[in-house]
Amino acid sequence: MHSLFRKRNKGKYSPTVQTRSISNKELSDLIEQLQKNADQVERNIVDTEAKMQSDLARMQEGQLPEHRDAALQNVSDSEKLLYVLEADSAIAKHMKHPQGDMIAEDIRQLKERVTNLRGKHKQMYSLAVKEADPRVNWDTLVDEKLDKLSSQSFGTDLPLVDSQVEQHNIFHNEVKAIGPHLAKDKEQNSELQAKYQKLLTASQARQQHLSSLQDYMQRCTNELYWLDQQAKGRMQYDWSDRNLDYPSRRRQYENFINRNLEAKEERINKLHTEGDQLLTAEHPGRNSIEAHMEAVHAEWKEYLNLLICEESHLKYMEDYHQFHKDMKDAQELLRKVDSDLNQKYSPDFKDRYQIELLLRELDDQEKALDKYEDVVRGLQRRGQQVVPLKYRRETPLKPIPVEALCDFESDQGLISRGYSYTLQKNNGESWELTDSTGKKLAAPAVCFIIPPTDPEALALADSLGSQYRSVRQKATGSKHALQQRHEVLRTENPGDASDLQGRQLLAGLDKVASDLDRQEKAITGILRPPLEQGRAIEDSAERAKGLKNITNELLQIEPEKTQCTAECEAFVQALPASGTAPLLKTRVEDTNQKYERLVWLLEAAQEKVDVANRLENSLQRGRELLASYENRLIQDDTMPESGHVLDRKRQELEAMASELQAHKSLLGEVGKNLQVAKQCSSSLASRFQEHCPDLERQEAEVHKLNQRFNNLSQQVERRAQSLQSARAAYDEYCSGYNRVLQFLAKTPSYEPQETDSLGQMETKLKNQKNLLDELASREQEVQKVYADSQQYQQAVKDYELEAEKLRSLLDLENGRNSHVNKRARLQSPAAKVKEEEAALAAKFTEVNAINRQRLQNLEFALNLLRQQPEAGVTHETLQGGKLSSGMEETWKIKKELEEEIERRQQLENEVKSAQEEIQTLKDQGPQESLVRKEVLKKVPDPALEESFQQLQQTLAEEQHKNQLLQEELGALQLRLQALEQETRDGGQEYVVKEVLRIEPDRAQEDEVLQLREELEALRRQKGAREAEVLLLQQRVAALAAEKSRVQEKVTEREVVKLQNDPQLEAEYRRLQEEHQREGTLREKQEEELSFLQAKLRRLEKERAMAEGKITVKEVLKVEKDAAVEREVNDLTRQYEDEAAKARSGQREKTELLRKIWALEEENAKVVVQEKVREIVRPDPKAESEVANLRLELVEQERKFRGAEEQLKSYQSELEALRNRGPQVEVKEVTKEVIKYTTDPETEQELQRLREEIMDKTRLIERCDLEIYQLKQEIQALKDTKPQVQTREVVQEILQFQEDPQTKKEVESLRIQLSEEQKKQVDLEGERASQEEKIKRKEEELAQQRKERVVRQEVVQYEDEPDLRAEVTAFTNSIDAELRQIDKLHVELRRLQHRRAELERQLEELERERQARRAAELEVQRLQQRLAALEQEEAKTGEKVTHTQKVVLQQDPQQTREHALLRAQLEEERHRRQLLEGELEPLRRKLAALEKAEIKEKVVFSESVQVEKGDTEQEIQRLKKSLEEESQSKRELDSEVTRLEAKLSELEFYNSKSSKELDFLREENHKLQLERQNLQLETRRLQSEIEMAATETRDLKNITTIDSGTHLNSRLWSLEKELDDLKKMSKDKDLEIDELQRRLGSVAVKREQRENHLRRSIVVIDPDTGRELSPEEAHRAGLIDWKMFVKLRSQECDWEEISVKGPNGESSVIHDRKSGKKFSIEDALQSGRLTAAQYDRYVNKDMSIQELAVLVSGQK
């Protein structure tokens, strides 16, 4: 529930609510407040009823009532509270509270009671004194409450228990409200008081039980959720070879095992203990407690199994990657040796001594290769054991065997640990398997391991072997070549004797140095590799032996070294001038130093290896010792049954504990050896930089050994304690059980007989009562037997829990490398004791019930005997027979009832015993002898259905809300434009709020996390529901089995199958798709709307141009220049084409500029977060897009400038042609003839139009065919709309006299032509767009089809037999790698496609969310602007204070907007004045026409003179003005849209829509009405303009030869037009006066603007993550006093107040922390602040904090 509702209007009691997002805490507070109000109403009702009863008694006595007003006030208060309760109930019901319907029903009942109470009040106090109404029947009320309380049960899930807690709190308050009235009523008897006390005690007990049950179930649910998350994390983890982050997973795993496992286990055990305590205390919610205990136990057991699997997987992953690493190292080493053999051991250009040295080194190299052969063989052996991890991420080509790592219960059956299965299909997290019988199974992949071998590992091992053999052969060949060269050099003539001797000595020193280097490498080769894990002791012993061999070799080298150095020194002394003397001297010193360093290194290495050997020996002894004790303990699955065996087992454990303490000294020895090893390692590291690789492992093993010892000691101690407590409890239980059993066996029977006399019957009755008393006294013994049984069972359970814990720890330690044979566990003795105790309790209950029934039978029979009169023997015998028959019938009925009761109790006990047996058997493990097949039934999840319905409702609300917001946005934009037009000249009142959040907006991530949490909650609830259904099914099955076969033991397993309802999932996906379609449809509608608007503007322009085509002219001479006319028409068309291109270029330029500004603003945003260090860099994609847009902008500007230049040239040419003017000759004929003829040009025009329509029709048909073909070719590219370019062609037509029929035909043809032209333009544009897309696609395909040239270097090798096997191996390896690469490429393409699809969906969702948020913010911002502009108070100020870290600065864009609006207002005024000036010539012309005389003439002319009248020019100017108005409106709309987007982003976090939504709706209604009025006015003006244009054309069509009748009609139309124009002028004048008046009222307003910055510093507690103030942090000890003073000094609270009035603008800086104010003007005058600095602040380059420091003079 994530919505909170607005506060109610305190003046009205309406239950209507409005929602917003709330949290769970707020909803719980709402429910708590609702309960308080309901309790208050209940108390008011009870109090009112009591007062009315008191007044009724007084009225019966003839006295006046006392509580009339008080009772009426209580009723009124209750009604008010009921209004509030209805509203809160509506909120709770709307938020889908589980008890929403129940709460509404309770409130309805309270309302009915209050209504009835008001009626009673009115009736009682309005009538005269009469008979008093009956009082409240408290006895009946208490009985009803008792019955209701006794019928209550306990819920099985947490939501139901929560609702029961809330309901019982209300019930308990009602019970407590009855108490004071019973105390006041003295006439109540003690029996009623006792009933009330019983009711109160029972209500308190239920309240405590519900509270404890709720707390226990909540903690169990928390643990179940944690365990479920942990299990899911391990199941979803990647355990394949692709995961290289396994070391961090290993550290995380060991950290949890060492630090958190015991604590978590303690919590689980604590829950189990508390559950047992609740069951022991006979908690009424036994079923719920047992179910949660079993669920926690099952989940914990599954979690331990997953830990075992995780340990195994980590080990296999480490082995896999270590093998590949070692293999890579070995291959690198062999490649290096091969390279050395090729380069270093070449015999070319070397003398004899160098070759001898190379031969010695080559001998050493061959020895090293001999030793390295063991490494290669070891890697080959390890390759046989490597697990094929690659198959975990892909399905193998054929089924492969897998091995189970743990026990797991799947839907199809049980998976046993250690058994083999066959993998059929790899589905990622889940695998499809088959067992040995062919049964199909499905289980998580984490529970299985694919056994060796790995084909890739085998191929690598074979490749390594081939490489090793090749290197050996090459070494042999190199040695042979060096030997041959050496023999050749020996036969050659030696040179100078001294040089020869020097070279011999150098060769000897080189040999000694190479020997020393070889020994040093051998020592480091021993020190650097870590000891082998499985044979550390043997490995350390072998290394010690190797060091001893090195010592012997070093002793052999020492004499040779001494001899060589002595000979070299003698040679240097004898021949110091020899060329080799300096080199010999240097070589001698180096050899001596190297020898000394080697001796020290050898000593340190021997000490290190010896210490490591001792440490490993001590660790091995400790492990073997602990393993022996652990193996002895792990054999005990459960506790022995008999008492003597218990004592013997306890003695064994005590002896084991003493032995462990005796061997504790071994751990001390291990610790000492570890310290010595650390010292040796530190010495090697400091002197020789040789670090020990085994030290960390040895420390971990020592720590693990100590931990195992402590665990073992605790295990032994706890087991001994459990045995001791079990022994004592078992002895007590046996003695009590035997006593009660003997007593029950010896219980006498006092059944009434037919022949019993009255005295005998009384004696039997007395004995039966004594027997019942004795049974009642024995009941305490039965309870003691039950308590002893529970204590024994708990001890056994603790013992078994410790055994299971030890087994789990050992599994985790060993990693389950080898499978332990499963064996059937023995039945727990606790189960046997539990069965005996249950049977004893059932038998005792049976005996007690039988004897109570006997007592009733005896009393009944005794009463019958006492009622019979004394009579004769015959009558007495007859009466006795009748009595016996009646009693027999009664006894039969009661006997049947008794049998049914016993049967029911027996079944209940058997169900309980079966449940306990199920739990016991689950703790013990699976019984191999019994198998139970279960049928799962899918039950719809109520919570999921509820969430589904809520999602449907939310989707419908969001769609409706989006539509309303769009409508409100359009209305408010119109209203904003009108108001801004009114306030352009005056001082504008506004508040600039620019908020920069210091923390990042993570709304999307929060929504994703919230959705995940809700989904997890739904899954848990669904799992709980399915578990309950399964439990009920198992109970029914158990009861049926027990009824048919009582002695059968059945092992039940609960299988919880988590599976969502497919229908709900399909519906949920359908709703998501519908949501996406709604968003897409909305975008399409917006695009269609914009297209229709553009089309409407184009049609209006075409209509105006079409109206202008018919030009009315006065013909004087009939002659025209055809060439000039054609040229003018061509220039006109060219002009319109260029103008259209210029406009489109300007629009593209504006759009590109807007995109660039948006990207720059987006990239310029700075996100700062103090808690987390983040580095914000611009998006490279955004930067590249900005660069592309800038290039496009430059190109468009260049094209635009070229178009402007061409347009200017055309305009100048057109002006020159117009200035030429026509040549006119006038010849006047005095004959007057009136002649009506049809214009031949009109006939030609009609014919031309007909032909053009036919052409256009054929062209459209061809275009339709082409478009259909194009659409078939590019169906995937139809989404984008083509750009339509409309060409407007203006043609002037000369018309003399119009025939009415011809005129109608021309109009119809012209309309058809216009429609065909529009269709043609649209189709041509669409065809051009489709052709462009086809061209682009063909280019892309052409680029993809380019040939790729692959150069391959072909090397031909000779067929050498030795390399053939290696080549074959490499070929197979390469083929395998290529296949793997192909698979990876296919997978990569699939993932990329999936990623693109997900990104597209995310972008669509983000656009939808941003569009909705933008619409909401638009409504909020426009409402705020409207409120600010319409406020008419003298002084207006708005103070904005944010406790967050904000930076408020002025917005220069808004200032420019205001200046632009003022300029547009001035322009509108100027246009109105022009219109008024143009009206005057029209009036004068009308007057002249009225006075003119009418003459008829026949006029012939030889040329045409085109003149435009004043009226036509006026119409043209009006049209032009209307177009300018439309253009200005569009520009204003685009500017307002941009500003609205910017302001909505700035005011996002300061919106107040929730508080002002009511006012907005009223304003929205007003604005809609005003918009309608404006639209009507606009249509009226347009119709008037069209009418004026029509009338003017009609007037111009009449020549001077018309008759007087025609002239009068035309004059009448002109008069009407003038009247309309006058009226329009008056309306405009009135509107201008109103605007001036409103502007005058706005101009006198003062403007006050406040910028506020408050910096508060918080300190984050590293332990809790809570934010603290510096004072709290100082008190908590997180910071010292110095830091506290520093942080306090950095806090600030600056506020800028700017007031603008008639005298100008003044600004001050207010320090709200100290109360001081600093004037900015004074700071400018005094020089503390410069004008440049202030301009920087105004332009947002300087923060208010920096300005405040400068103004205050603090810096």
UniProtKB/Swiss-Prot annotation:
GO terms for cellular component: cornified envelope; cytoplasm; cytoskeleton; desmosome; extrinsic component of plasma membrane; plasma membrane. Residues 16-125, 182-387, 611-819, 883-1644 form a coiled coil. Keywords: Cell junction, Cell membrane, Coiled coil, Cytoplasm, Cytoskeleton, Keratinization, Membrane, Phosphoprotein, Repeat, SH3 domain. Pfam families: SH3_10, Spectrin_1st_PEPL. Expressed in the retinal lens (at protein level). Homodimer or a heterodimer with EVPL. Found in a complex composed of PPL (via C-terminal linker domain), BFSP1 and BFSP2 in the retinal lens. Within the complex interacts (via C-terminal linker domain) with BFSP2. Interacts with VIM. Binds to the PH domain of AKT1. Interacts with FCGR1A. May interact with PPHLN1. Component of the cornified envelope of keratinocytes. May link the cornified envelope to desmosomes and intermediate filaments. May act as a localization signal in PKB/AKT-mediated signaling. This is Periplakin. The gene is Ppl.
